[in-house]
Curated annotation (Swiss-Prot):
Its main location: plastid. It is an enzyme of class 4 (lyase). Gene3D superfamilies: Ribulose bisphosphate carboxylase, large subunit, C-terminal domain, RuBisCO large subunit, N-terminal domain. The disulfide bond which can form in the large chain dimeric partners within the hexadecamer appears to be associated with oxidative stress and protein turnover. This is Ribulose bisphosphate carboxylase large chain. Coiled coil: none annotated. GO terms for cellular component: chloroplast. It is found in: Plastid, Chloroplast. Substrate binds at N114, T164, K168, R286, H318, S370. Heterohexadecamer of 8 large chains and 8 small chains; disulfide-linked. The disulfide link is formed within the large subunit homodimers.
Length: 468
């Protein structure tokens, strides 16, 4: 007799196991499943578990050569999504042995691989992952983390201030360096290469690195504060990326930058290891994230990309503003900000957190608020993000009517006023505008900024919202 029975079996016979008790070593995933009509919920959840682990569409004789019970993913719970017709959250447990140690690339290749093109599903979204502590311990994580960064910069008790140099493309290296100098001289802690500044004909990377290093050393000498410029090391190959990071280290600058989604997780982890070994901080930009995370029914939520970044490595990552021009609902944003910074985060569905996550002392990542923010937003940003954040004003610095340095002064005065008011027990959410007005009496730069941006609003509802 034949040792196995050929043919197509329902996935739920093997992969839907509601009685399964999850293990501390399992990777747990919460998928939002939108099926084709007529497919029962158990079959959908089981199909996701199968296609992202050991299953294929038909029975194969080589199944008998391994222990599927040991290696298969299991759909262990399904719940309907409130307010949505025929949409479910499927919870899947993956055994740890399915994944290579220390590889975000391998983890994502399994969990968000071919299954997202599966015909039986109209749409599929990965809402959250629970990374087991045993797997976290195979990663280095952020090169330095929040406390080490503060110690390196000697800056405590307040958020850090940044600015993206604009126009993002087209400046020569010397003019670019001049813009950096003006911002840092005015009181900012950091300036930033835009994510698409790499090494183009109008400004090659080596020239930019040299002029920016000159600018930050000059600003440091004048202000007595440590300054940084995020030198974007992102390149077409890993070798070229590391070459740029090496040159940044030789210049003695404190921080480099990487576009982690367009650059890829393998490149990002490589750079993070180099940065820890060589004392460089690593700023991460999330260009391309909205392609993956903006649609509510398909793709992957940013909280998963944020967890992946903390594993792969980065000291800063862009994380939305709540109040500016880019997508981000308050409760959702605060949920993944906690996932970036804190050591232990409780399950809290009201903030989109599906699983309790223990980071077992993996260093934290500083969230960066950037995109359409200006001095009037300062009280809200200080209240929402607290001290461990970088508040990044591009147009909100460079758009000042008197120039870059006065724009930087306006932001620094507004920030110091908000921190002082908070420390005195004032409510920034209620008294924010009053605090800024009071400060502007003593700072003509801030008064001018207040006048320019007093009418600016980005009143659009977020696309990706919490379920009711």
């Amino acid at each position: 007799s034949v040792g196995f029975k050929a043919g197509v079996k329902d996935y739920k016979l093997n992969y839907y196991t509601p009685q399964y008790q999850t293990k501390d070593t399992d990777i747990l995933a919460a998928f939002r499943v939108t099926p084709q009509p007529g497919v029962p919920p158990e079959e959908r959840g089981a199909a996701v578990a199968a296609e992202s682990s050991t299953g294929t569409w038909t029975t194969v004789w080589t199944d008998g050569l391994t222990s599927l019970d040991r290696y298969k993913g299991r759909c262990y719970h399904i719940e309907p999504v409130v307010g949505e017709e025929d949409q479910y959250i499927a919870y899947v447990a993956y055994p740890l042995d399915l994944f290579e140690e220390g590889s975000v690339t391998n983890m994502f290749t399994s969990i968000v691989g071919n299954v997202f093109g599966f015909k039986a599903l109209r749409a599929l979204r990965l809402e959250d992952l629970r990374i087991p502590t045993s797997y976290i311990k195979t990663f280095q994580g952020p090169p330095h983390g929040i406390q080490v960064e503060r110690d390196k910069l000697n800056k405590y008790g307040r958020p850090l201030l940044g600015c993206t140099i604009k126009p993002k493309l087209g400046l020569s290296a010397k003019n670019y360096g001049r813009a950096v100098y003006e911002c840092l001289r005015g009181g900012l802690d950091f300036t930033k290469d835009d994510e698409n500044v790499n090494s183009q004909p109008f400004m090659r990377w080596r020239d930019r690195f040299l002029f920016c290093a000159e600018a930050l050393y000059k600003a440091q000498a004048e202000t007595g504060e440590i300054k940084g410029h995020y030198l974007n090391a992102t390149a077409g190959t890993c070798e070229e990326m590391i070459k740029r990071a090496v040159f940044a280290r030789e210049l003695g600058v404190p921080i480099v930058m990487h576009d982690y989604l367009t650059g890829g997780f393998t490149a990002n982890t490589t750079l993070a290891h180099y940065c820890r070994d060589n004392g460089l901080l690593l700023h991460i930009h999330r260009a391309m994230h909205a392609v993956i995370d903006r649609q509510k029914n398909h793709g992957m939520h940013f909280r998963v990309l944020a967890k992946a970044l903390r594993l792969s490595g980065g000291d800063h990552v862009h994380a939305g503003t709540v109040v500016g021009k880019l997508e981000g609902e308050r409760d959702i944003t605060l949920g993944f900000v906690d996932l970036l910074r804190d050591d232990f985060i409780e399950k809290d569905r009201s903030r989109g957190i599906y699983f309790t996550q223990d980071w077992v002392s993996l260093p934290g990542v500083i969230p960066v608020a950037s995109g359409g923010i200006h001095v009037w937003h300062m009280p809200a940003l200080t209240e929402i993000f607290g001290d461990d954040a970088v508040l990044q004003f591009g147009g909100g610095t460079l758009g000042h009517p008197w120039g870059n340095a006065p724009g930087a002064v306006a932001n620094r005065v507004a920030l110091e006023a908000c921190v002082k008011a908070r420390n005195e027990g004032r409510d920034l959410a209620v008294e924010g505008n009053e605090i800024i007005r009071e400060a502007s009496k003593w700072s003509p730069e801030l008064a001018a900024a207040c006048e320019v941006w007093k009418e600016i609003r980005f009143n659009f509802a977020a696309v990706d919202t919490l379920d009711p």
